[in-house]
Amino acid sequence: MTFPPLKSPLKFYAVVPTADWVGRMVKAGADTVQLRCKALHGDELKREIARCAAACQGSRTQLFINDHWREAIEAGAYGVHLGQEDMDTADLAAIAAAGLRLGLSTHSVAELDRALSVHPSYIASGAIFPTTTKQMPTAPQGLDKLREYVKQAGGTPVVAIGGIDLNNARAVLATGVSSLAAVRAVTEAANPEAVVKAFQALWDG
């Protein structure tokens, strides 16, 4: 089982709750966006994911769908992001056969080993700093552990997530990760589009 490699580096990775937010991120020029939608189900969820795919079509933005792999395949999304618990229930072979990229969350050395065993397109490591976005199973990882995870991942791209903002972004990038993911730094910003551009400038200058 092999998942496609990334077509281009993930760089700044915005995690947002709705298709409207996805559209805003595309217009702002975000390299990567993830729909993390917990509020919708059934046909409403399918329509929301289809709207996300339409918003990203023809743009530079790479669209990942959190958890909902069946709907992501149906909508023709760029990829799927799964948590550790989802690895037990998702049909990874179906995701690979559909040509979608796969990202996996990790919170420890053991989880990273498990994720790498299925050869994902990238792994996410976190939470790096304290975060209130979601309940985390482990304490914040910090930058020293993150450096070790980057080494352990080898050639697999690593996305750092959890409490990342423009104040600590450069220090996180210095660990060797290829991408920074942000939730609250975008969705709670007075000017989210300006935040996206400031993050992008860390790579694009």
Curated annotation (Swiss-Prot):
Keywords attached to this entry: Magnesium, Metal-binding, Thiamine biosynthesis, Transferase
Q: Name one GO biological process term.
A: thiamine diphosphate biosynthetic process
Q: Superkingdom of the source? A: Bacteria
Pfam hit, one: TMP-TENI
Q: Give the pathway.
A: Cofactor biosynthesis; thiamine diphosphate biosynthesis; thiamine phosphate from 4-amino-2-methyl-5-diphosphomethylpyrimidine and 4-methyl-5-(2-phosphoethyl)-thiazole: step 1/1
Molecular function terms from GO: magnesium ion binding; thiamine-phosphate diphosphorylase activity
Catalyzes what?
Answer: 2-[(2R,5Z)-2-carboxy-4-methylthiazol-5(2H)-ylidene]ethyl phosphate + 4-amino-2-methyl-5-(diphosphooxymethyl)pyrimidine + 2 H(+) = thiamine phosphate + CO2 + diphosphate; 2-(2-carboxy-4-methylthiazol-5-yl)ethyl phosphate + 4-amino-2-methyl-5-(diphosphooxymethyl)pyrimidine + 2 H(+) = thiamine phosphate + CO2 + diphosphate; 4-methyl-5-(2-phosphooxyethyl)-thiazole + 4-amino-2-methyl-5-(diphosphooxymethyl)pyrimidine + H(+) = thiamine phosphate + diphosphate
Q: Where does Mg(2+) bind?
A: 67, 86
The UniProt record lists the keyword DNA-binding: no
Look up the record and report any one GO term of the cellular component aspect.
cytoplasm
EC number of the protein: 2.5.1.3
Where along the chain is 4-amino-2-methyl-5-(diphosphooxymethyl)pyrimidine bound? 34-38, 66, 105, 134
The answer to keyword Magnesium applying to this record is yes
Q: What is its biological role?
A: Condenses 4-methyl-5-(beta-hydroxyethyl)thiazole monophosphate (THZ-P) and 2-methyl-4-amino-5-hydroxymethyl pyrimidine pyrophosphate (HMP-PP) to form thiamine monophosphate (TMP).
Family stated for the protein in its record? Belongs to the thiamine-phosphate synthase family.
Q: What NCBIfam families does the database record attribute to this sequence?
A: PRK03512.1, thiE
State the name under which the record lists this protein. Thiamine-phosphate synthase
User: What is the species of this protein?
Assistant: Neisseria meningitidis serogroup B (strain ATCC BAA-335 / MC58)
